[in-house]
Amino acid sequence: MDKKTLSIVGASGYAGGEFLRLALSHPYLEVKQVTSRRFAGEPVHFVHPNLRGRTNLKFIPPEKLEPADILVLALPHGVFAREFDRYSALAPILIDLSADFRLKDPELYRRYYGEHPRPDLLGCFVYAVPELYREALKGADWIAGAGCNATATLLGLYPLLKAGVLKPTPIFVTLLISTSAAGAEASPASHHPERAGSIRVYKPTGHRHTAEVVENLPGRPEVHLTAIATDRVRGILMTAQCFVQDGWSERDVWQAYREAYAGEPFIRLVKQKKGVHRYPDPRFVQGTNYADIGFELEEDTGRLVVMTAIDNLVKGTAGHALQALNVRMGWPETLGLDFPGLHP
């Protein structure tokens, strides 16, 4: 099979660099060009030392981009939308890792991000969560990567709402997130002496990924997200507090997950009765495209605690985007992604 050429815009950041790492091992992809204004002329390993010896590519300025089969855009929010015409002319297949085209509802976008530069294009991209939108992705030329916190939340809650397991009451979500979720650009909040050893509530209300969660969950339930920053480099642990319908049992919860995720290559249900590793832990999915999902039901009250662990840069960003590309191209879904995490 002839390889498809792929270029990455914004490849010096964490999201673009992670897509590059995965793409370099993909048997059907040839990485053609990678861009960075700041590091133009520098070899890739100058910014991503883990890729030393894996590629001889050097960063180029975006103005020197040539046409390719696939263009991955890992730009700050708003940039791709403002320069859409220029970038869309370079490749028939576009994969956007920013928030620019994740939402279809212009009012939701306005509430969380402000005015959209290209509201006429909202709804033209397919949301890159294969577990939810596999059929739509099969014919998608424009793909919008999901937010990392939204990915963790959606994967944990979607089967329960689809099966009618939950009461129509507000769902409260807490997200323990890592430092890399803030991106490669340094800030006072990410400065090591300020961040190391700290567990900081940084977004108690109004988290932007709430919009994606609400728009993509069945019935558009009332969901409230609180984000807590930890000093881990990678990983997200999502816990959701909700209530099951009267008379519903643990068996019903199991059934909802098994029906939704039967045969899913990157979903693992983690709920053991004994041992140290009874529930999902971001440590064991670090660097992988797996999502570990678990739960615990308080039978006498009906309170259900749902847990999801993912790597924010892989399953939360570049990994699910590459998985979506595999679906789009008709390739085996696990290509470039089929590897386990580390232990210990």
Swiss-Prot record:
Subcellular localization: Cytoplasm
Catalytic activity: [amino-group carrier protein]-C-terminal-N-(1-carboxy-5-oxopentan-1-yl)-L-glutamine + phosphate + NADP(+) = [amino-group carrier protein]-C-terminal-N-(1-carboxy-5-phosphooxy-5-oxopentan-1-yl)-L-glutamine + NADPH + H(+)
Main location: cytoplasm
Active-site residues, record numbering mapped to chain: 148
Gene3D superfamilies documented for this protein: Dihydrodipicolinate Reductase, domain 2, NAD(P)-binding Rossmann-like Domain
Gene that this sequence comes from: lysY
UniProt-reported outcome of changing residue 209 to A: Does not affect activity under basic conditions. Strong decrease of activity under neutral conditions
Name of the protein in question: [LysW]-L-2-aminoadipate 6-phosphate reductase
Reported function: Catalyzes the NADPH-dependent reduction of [LysW]-aminoadipate 6-phosphate to yield [LysW]-aminoadipate 6-semialdehyde.
SMART domains the record matches: Semialdhyde_dh
